[in-house]
Amino acid sequence: MTNGSLVQSLRSHLAWWGLKRFTSDEAYFQWQRETLSPVEIATLLREVEQKRRGSSADEVSFYDATAGSNILPVLHSQQYDYYLAIGPRVTDRIGKARSIQSILDVGCGAGILTTFYAREHPDRRFVGIDRSSASIARATKQAQALGLTNVQFECLDLEHMPPTHFSDLVLATHVLVQAEQDPGVPSRSWNTFERAGESELQADFERRTGIGARLDHLNALLSAQGRMIVFEKTRQLARRVPLQRALAARGLGLIEQPELIRYRLVEEIADDGPFYVLGRGASRQFHWDDSPEPDEGPPFDRAKLKSGLTDPDEPLYENHWPSAQHVWEQLRDKHFLKETTKQEPDGRQLHVELGQAEEGVYLYFANTLDQRQLVLVEPARMAMLESYYQEILDSISS
């Protein structure tokens, strides 16, 4: 099946589930008000807030409460483009690997994608597991309605999955790194993107996010030549590097080049991933990349600094991306006018400097969570950068 027909098949599947695609928040919430009763909307809002602030038990409660026939399609329509991004990619990998006969979908929820995979590959066996009993009940009911006999759903926590249940492919999408607010592992210092090889920082990340224990359990469920597809919210380098190190430490290697994926959540743009296809003892053709991804920072052309200006109030150059570090390193004859470096007890650093270079007066900001900023202006406008420098210092102290 071509990718176009696969996407169309998935659209039909999502429509069967009652999902709709929206690109406008206004249109989406209008549909929500038309579809759900005031009581259902109040329940949804209450559960969303409790999930945001609560524990693992609150998260299970959220999915139990929202697995109902009316709320589920409304809630999951927000993720319509996520399904379009992940569903065809996973389905394609299953189809191309004939050695994959048994597939385990961890954190399958109500089985929206799991049932799609089972429909597209009736000759393969699928098992979906989730901690939410209501989600599993809904998934089982929907699979029966679709007449699927090659998929089953079980209400299980990953930690309680019997180690005899081996699979040729384990799917883990948005399930391993559930601590969305965790900043990750800082770099060695503010002027590098490299992470130290210290096992203590890595172990602490794996422990506080729970990824270490989850990966250990997944690895135990993988057949000898099994594969794993992982897609998490680890786009930031400080989260991507420790995830990759956790995977590599458990003998998982890259089968193909990881893919960064962008999709919409109604009006919001989500940059997620990478999308990893992994295997035990994978070839050395692909290597883990611990460097920042290419960004949208403007190119630096010394010859065009002044000639390219169209607005006299604009800086000569401005970059708020990791690539700003490379430009800062290129500035000629730099010398500090002011500088401050703050170090936290946990080793994180923040550095800001106001300086003079051949190209002009600059302000440079960097920290160990890979944020970079560089602003360059003519010497006559140095007061603007001095004010900006002080604002940063005030924000640090507060």
Q: Where do the model's predicted regions map?
A:
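Conserved alpha-helix/loop element of class I SAM-dependent methyltransferases that forms part
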Residues: Y80-S99
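Conserved SAM/SAH-binding beta-strand->alpha-helix loop
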Residues: S132
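Conserved SAM-binding loop
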Residues: A139-T140
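Mobile active-site "lid"/loop adjacent to the S-adenosyl-L-methionine
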Residues: T173-A213, H217
